[in-house]
């Protein structure tokens, strides 16, 4: 369920969280996709990306969207430099300050909306997913002194070790998050683990 209404006169999108409608739609989809041993796990809100923007990963996702925009707009160099990362982080921080008075849901909508073009489509989804994965890996790795964040896409190449305490903390946050729980449960179910 899209968290907005469209003004019939101006065609402008007006935020409307629609919690009840989202909950009902999720329940219907889960029933629809559950059959025998196959079980449906669908997002509790509009899309996967919107749920991530609502979740404990919101700040990381917001930055990843800006990293993705920098990569998409870099015609010649499809990588992030420290300067571009700094600009993207600053852009995300500026927006976060501007959006402080908004509800979490409206902030998430604004973050997700950054990914969309005028037609409501996005060519950023795959890029943002890679950026988010790299940012989370960076966040949970033991980074040697002098290594800058532009290396976040090459952590395996450099053989950086994982900081197990940071990884465990992030795992706990993700597993407890109400907007990510459906993904965690789907993975556990597919792996034969108890959910």
Q: What kind of feature is each model-predicted range?
A:
Residues 1-195:
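Acidic, Mg2+-coordinating catalytic modules of nucleic-acid enzymes
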């Amino acid at each position: 369920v899209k968290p907005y209404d469209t003004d019939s006169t101006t065609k402008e999108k007006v935020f409307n969280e629609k919690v009840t409608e989202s909950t009902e739609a999720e329940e219907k989809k889960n029933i629809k996709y559950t059959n025998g041993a196959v079980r449906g796990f669908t997002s509790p809100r509009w899309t996967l990306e919107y749920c991530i923007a609502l979740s404990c990963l919101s700040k990381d996702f917001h930055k990843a969207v800006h990293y993705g925009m920098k990569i998409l707009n870099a015609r010649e160099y499809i990588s992030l430099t420290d300067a571009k990362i700094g600009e993207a982080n600053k852009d995300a921080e500026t927006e976060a300050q501007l959006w402080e008075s908004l509800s979490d849901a409206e902030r998430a909508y604004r973050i997700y909306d950054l990914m969309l073009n005028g037609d409501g489509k996005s060519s950023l989804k795959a890029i943002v997913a890679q950026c988010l994965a790299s940012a989370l890996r960076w966040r949970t790795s033991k980074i040697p002194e002098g290594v800058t964040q532009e290396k976040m896409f090459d952590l395996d190449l450099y053989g950086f070790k994982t900081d197990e305490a940071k990884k465990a903390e992030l795992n706990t946050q993700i597993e407890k998050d109400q907007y990510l729980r459906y993904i965690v449960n789907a993975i556990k179910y597919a792996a034969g683990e108890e959910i």
